[in-house]
């Protein structure tokens, strides 16, 4: 068997050569910015203080030098020079509090995003960017304040995952507004539905039905989510009106008509004092 090898001056011989990479000794700190970090390296022959020529007398290569973590710079002799020199350097993750990082909720970054109460936890679209470039959602988690269901201001926090190009966390706020059940007319707002109202009898001179109200298929609670008031609800045969008004997490109002019918309890039933009939042979009866 034969093996090929080069004979030349060994650049790692510290008595003959100095290999310098100032960025690795002067306190330079590399922080992830999406670009490749390539600290400059020079090789000098001590005798005569002669600098060797990069790419002619030696080559420099870098590995793992973009993302946060440990990068390596390698120098290898070329031509009449041999040997390999390696050093590692650290690339720190970018802190999410950096001014070049932006956290947007619902497309806005100033905390002014508003969304309507839904009855369920509200988790709007969240986007984290660095220098205008979207950060992968696999690099961070999103958490919410204690209550992101009811109306009010909610704090949202994005926290970088370990082992990614980022560290720390960044927070913003958004607002959950009251859900409007309607604009005062006879058409409920989107997502709301009023249950059917059967004809109502007068009780103590008025008819006061309490129709069911649904939001996104969930039945709301009378007295907690809405109240009812009435118009024209004291006359039989009229088109009475019930007004459902939002309270609690709801606002706005919507109307629905209903019929008022006579109460059978108020009816007078009379029966003749004497009622008889005469039946004939043909099967017919004569009432008398």
Indicate residue ranges for each PLM-predicted region.
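Solvent-exposed, low-complexity, repeat-rich "mucin-like" stalks and linkers
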Residues: 4-49, 93-133, 177-218, 263-288
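Serine/threonine-rich, repeat-prone extracellular segments and beta-strand-based repeat modules
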Residues: 1-6, 50-82, 87-89, 133-167, ...
């Amino acid at each position: 068997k034969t093996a090929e090898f080069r004979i030349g001056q060994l650049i790692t011989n510290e008595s003959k050569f100095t290999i310098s990479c100032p960025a690795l000794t002067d306190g330079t700190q590399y922080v992830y910015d999406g670009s490749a970090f390539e600290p400059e390296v020079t090789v000098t022959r001590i005798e005569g203080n002669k600098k060797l020529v990069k790419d002619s007398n030696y080559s420099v290569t870098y590995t793992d030098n973009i993302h946060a973590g440990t990068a390596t710079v390698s120098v290898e002799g070329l031509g009449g020079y041999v040997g390999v020199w390696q050093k590692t350097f650290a690339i720190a993750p970018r802190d999410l509090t950096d001014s070049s990082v932006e956290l947007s909720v619902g497309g806005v970054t100033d905390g002014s995003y508003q969304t309507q109460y839904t009855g369920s936890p509200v988790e709007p679209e969240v986007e984290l960017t660095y220098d205008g470039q979207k950060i992968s959602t696999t690099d961070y988690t999103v958490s919410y304040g204690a209550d992101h269901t009811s109306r009010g201001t909610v704090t949202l926090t994005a926290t970088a995952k370990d082992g990614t190009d980022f560290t720390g966390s960044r927070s913003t706020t958004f607002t959950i507004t009251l859900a409007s059940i309607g604009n005062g007319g006879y058409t409920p707002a989107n997502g709301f539905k009023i249950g059917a109202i059967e004809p109502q009898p007068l009780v103590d001179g008025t008819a006061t039905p309490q129709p069911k109200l649904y939001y996104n298929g969930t039945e709301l609670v009378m007295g907690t989510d809405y109240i009812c008031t009435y118009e024209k609800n004291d006359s039989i045969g009229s088109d009475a009106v019930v007004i459902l008004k939002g309270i609690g997490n709801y606002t706005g109002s919507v109307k629905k008509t209903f019929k008022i019918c006579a109460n059978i309890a108020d009816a007078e039933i009379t029966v003749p004092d004497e009622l008889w009939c005469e039946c004939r042979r043909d099967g017919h009866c004569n009432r008398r």
